[in-house]
Regions:
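Active-site nucleophile loop of the alpha/beta-hydrolase fold
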Residues: 1-2, 82
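Acidic/polar loop patches that form or flank catalytic/metal-binding clefts of enzymes
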Residues: 2, 34-36, 152-157, 226-238
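Short, charged, surface-exposed loops that flank catalytic or proteolytic processing sites
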Residues: 2-24
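Short alpha-helical patches at coil-to-helix transitions and adjacent helical residues
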Residues: 5, 139, 213-217
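Surface-exposed intrinsically disordered loops and tails
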Residues: 5-10, 235-241
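Substrate-gating cap/lid region and adjacent catalytic-acid/histidine neighborhood
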Residues: 19-207
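Non-catalytic, well-ordered alpha-helical segments in soluble enzyme domains
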Residues: 208-231
């Protein structure tokens, strides 16, 4: 590098012109750029950060396209799962006691499973508040901003499915229902034919889950074709409003 320590690097960077900065970055290798990004602070401080470079991302930040009606726009679907943060809370040992898997789980190599939600009311409260905040920031507010700025091709959903079984005494509907990433299963219907998913994860809810998957795929395919989920590709579902 051009500096031996952080303060010297900051001073050097602040003294560089935009052209010098551009030249320096364009001459860096992909490996150097990714290494610097990976070592940036705060580490593990959240999702990948967005840089307001004024080109890829507007100078006003990631929310600018939602309020600036002069920027190019395309139809958009925004959405979250009802209990997004359950995926993370269930792995927090302060909330959930984990232990050795039994029966088929031991046989297929699952070393640990959730055995008890230690404080269910607290677990549910933490999940509700944090998931509601996620929904407000990721779906509701951007959608309202788009509509308020005159853009009507804006659609919102919430994924609520939580019909999961009881496993080793733990109600997985409470533990992980409608959690982050659970909806992905419904977008790849071949997964429903997987033995573990069909007979362990979904069990008695298979028919309902498959129907929901078919409806989601129909709406989303129609959106991809036309920019409006409407009544789905089959044109026989409730109109998305």
């Amino acid at each position: 590098g051009k500096a031996d320590e952080i303060e010297g690097a900051k001073a050097l960077q602040n003294s560089m012109s935009l052209k010098e900065t551009e030249t320096f970055l364009r001459n860096a290798t992909p490996g150097e750029l990714l290494t610097a990004y990976g070592e940036a602070n705060p580490k593990r401080g959240g999702m990948t950060r967005v840089f307001n470079d004024g080109y890829v991302m507007g100078k006003e930040g990631i929310s600018e396209p939602f309020v600036n009606d002069q920027m190019p726009r395309v139809p958009i679907i925004l959405g979250t799962n009802r209990y997004e943060t359950k995926l993370f809370n269930m792995m927090n040992r302060r909330f959930v006691r984990w232990g050795e898997g039994e029966g088929i789980f031991s046989w297929i190599g699952v070393d640990e499973l959730p055995l008890e939600i230690m404080r269910p009311d607290f677990y549910n409260a933490v999940t509700q508040y944090s998931s509601d905040s996620w929904k407000e920031r990721a779906a509701d507010t951007p959608a309202r901003q788009l509509v308020a700025s005159g853009y009507k091709k804006t659609f919102v959903y919430r994924f609520d499915w939580d019909d999961l079984p009881v496993i080793q005494g733990v109600d997985y509907g409470v533990l992980a229902g409608a959690a982050h990433a659970l909806e992905i299963l419904f977008l790849f219907p071949a997964a429903f034919d997987n033995f573990i998913i069909k007979n362990v994860v979904i069990r008695d809810s298979y028919d309902g889950a498959k129907k929901l998957s078919d409806q989601m795929l129909s709406y989303w395919a129609q959106f991809a074709y036309t920019g409006d989920p409407g009544k789905g590709r089959s044109n026989d579902l409730p109109k998305w409003k």
